[in-house]
């Protein structure tokens, strides 16, 4: 008897090869001669390598520095794999995303590795209404011939995966998601994960066939009646390679079976679009937080990676959004348990947010994104079509206010974030949004220059600067972070005066300036900061 759990989730049918970025930090690997060595992982499922403490690329088998010829061969292999993985997205540009009312998650064991986490716990992590957890552990590693121990404490988490997608969509979509299994596959984990996940397609195929044999009706997962299952998510037992698991483990990713040598048909439907991730965190030894799941499921929705997917130049000049964003390094926030909420751009792309275009000079009061449900857009000509997944002009800037609350609790800082968008259908389709220093697709405008591999509080305004003048004729000055998280600033030199704006949501309170005093506007009534009606 299969056990099915339901959860409110979201899905779409965009299918481009995408994956989790490698977790930064030292991990221990064992060479073929038994020697242990501290290494650092770079890249993602489709293009990755490891280095030693000095930054030398290492041979995966011997853990010795590669020769120039070996590195060139690795670069060629990575390029070939990227080219092979580039697939065309199903047409969605300029049209409504195809949101499936139900989705399927299949738990699988390997022949030599079974789930140690109870199915009920996985269920709660995916769909629990009030999911929470706490734990602590010591992580020991060697660096520069010295041994260090890092004590990690997680005293609470953001919530379940269901809660994450409900929150970041502001409750606009509530499909059902079913969790089944675990089922046991026919082979050891190394069979599916070896040689850069060479046989992972067979894991997806077997998982679907085992679920089908158990009575799962796949026809309910073809929302648009196109003869294909909208998507399948496989959660596999044990470690994943992205956060330090052995090389033979599978790297969490999103892909399409139709662009591999594997074909799968169940209940007369083709299985194509899939995502997968691991049960256990290599660092903690406990079940993985929702960060990886939410990152991979965001690809199912149609969102691309925002870290550098080219791999070869990682951390050597391309500064991406890092811990600020779920599609970059953010899924590792709070030990992988509290990924950041969707940015204004991601909500704009999904159709959940329509930013306001700044035109004339004004003194702006901008509430935190999740309170005001608002963002501001700046572009040449001061006019925009406001279609997130087919923008015109394609180049524009978004300003949003973020505070360290809710899913954003573990952001590097808070305040005003300004992001430059340079949309290219080709780069989005091929998951290469931020692979060129001169052609970044989603580029955080750091308030203070930051070239490190870590996001900083000074990336935000006003922590890094109280003005922004990088975009001619769209200057922001007097940027101020107020108690409660809102920001104010002068746009195009406007003086601070009373701010008259509309309410962002039916019952959402909004702080405003009235005759130089801070007041709160809610349901058509003005209140002072003590809650007295004015």
Question: How would you describe each model-predicted region?
Answer:
Residues 317-358:
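Post-HExxH zinc-binding segment in Zn-dependent metallohydrolases
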Residues 526-532:
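Short, glycine-anchored, charge-dense loop/turn motifs used at functional sites
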Residues 218-231, 388:
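Acidic, glycine-anchored loop motifs typical of Ca2+
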Residues 31, 116-121, 125, 131-156, ...:
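Non-catalytic C-terminal accessory/binding modules of secreted extracellular proteins
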């Amino acid at each position: 008897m299969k056990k099915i759990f339901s959860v409110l989730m979201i899905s779409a049918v965009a299918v481009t090869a995408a994956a989790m970025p490698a977790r930064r930090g030292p991990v221990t690997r064992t060479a073929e001669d038994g020697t242990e060595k501290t290494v650092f992982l770079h890249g993602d499922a489709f293009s990755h390598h490891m280095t030693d403490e000095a930054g030398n690329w290492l041979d995966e088998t011997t853990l010795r520095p590669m020769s120039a010829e070996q590195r060139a061969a690795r670069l060629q292999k990575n390029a070939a794999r990227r080219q092979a993985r580039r697939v065309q997205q199903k047409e969605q540009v300029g049209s409504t995303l195809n949101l499936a009312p139900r989705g399927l998650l299949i738990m699988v064991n390997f022949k030599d590795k079974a789930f140690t986490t109870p199915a009920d716990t996985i269920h709660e992590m995916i769909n629990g209404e009030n999911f929470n957890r706490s734990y602590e552990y010591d992580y020991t590693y060697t660096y520069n011939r010295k041994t260090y121990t890092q004590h990690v404490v997680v005293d609470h988490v953001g919530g379940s995966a269901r809660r994450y997608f409900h929150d970041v969509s502001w409750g606009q979509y509530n499909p059902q998601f079913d969790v089944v299994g675990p089922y046991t596959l026919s082979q050891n984990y190394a069979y599916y994960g070896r040689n850069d996940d060479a046989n992972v397609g067979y894991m997806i195929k077997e998982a679907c066939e085992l679920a089908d044999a158990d009575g799962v009706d796949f026809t309910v997962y073809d929302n648009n009646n196109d003869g294909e299952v909208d998507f399948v998510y496989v959660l596999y037992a044990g470690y994943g390679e992205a956060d330090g698991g052995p090389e033979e483990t599978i790297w969490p990713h999103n892909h399409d079976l139709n662009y591999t040598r594997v074909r799968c048909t169940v209940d007369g439907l083709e299985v194509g679009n899939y995502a997968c991730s691991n049960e256990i965190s290599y660092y903690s030894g406990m079940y993985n937080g929702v960060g990886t799941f939410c990152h991979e499921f965001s690809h199912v929705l149609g969102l691309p990676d925002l870290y550098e997917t080219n791999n070869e130049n990682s951390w050597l000049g391309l500064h991406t959004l890092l811990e600020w964003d779920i599609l970059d390094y953010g899924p590792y926030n709070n030990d992988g348990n509290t990924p950041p909420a969707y940015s204004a751009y991601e909500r704009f792309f999904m159709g959940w947010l329509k930013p306001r275009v700044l035109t004339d000079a004004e003194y702006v009061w901008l509430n935190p994104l999740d309170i005001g449900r608002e963002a501001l857009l700046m572009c040449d000509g001061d006019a925009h079509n406001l279609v997130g997944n087919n923008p015109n002009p394609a180049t524009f800037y978004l300003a949003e206010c973020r505070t360290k609350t809710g899913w954003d609790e573990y952001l590097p800082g808070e305040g005003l974030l300004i992001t430059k968008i340079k949309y290219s259908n080709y780069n989005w389709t091929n998951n290469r949004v931020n692979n060129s220093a001169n052609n970044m697709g989603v580029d955080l405008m750091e308030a203070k220059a930051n070239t490190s591999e870590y996001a900083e509080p000074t990336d935000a305004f006003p922590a890094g600067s109280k003005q922004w003048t990088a975009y001619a004729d769209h200057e922001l000055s007097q940027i101020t972070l107020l108690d409660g998280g809102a920001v104010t600033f002068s746009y195009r030199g406007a003086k601070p005066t009373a701010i008259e704006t509309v309410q962002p949501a039916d019952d959402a309170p909004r702080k405003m300036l009235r005759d130089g005093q801070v007041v709160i506007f809610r349901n058509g009534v003005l209140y002072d900061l003590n809650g007295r009606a004015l």
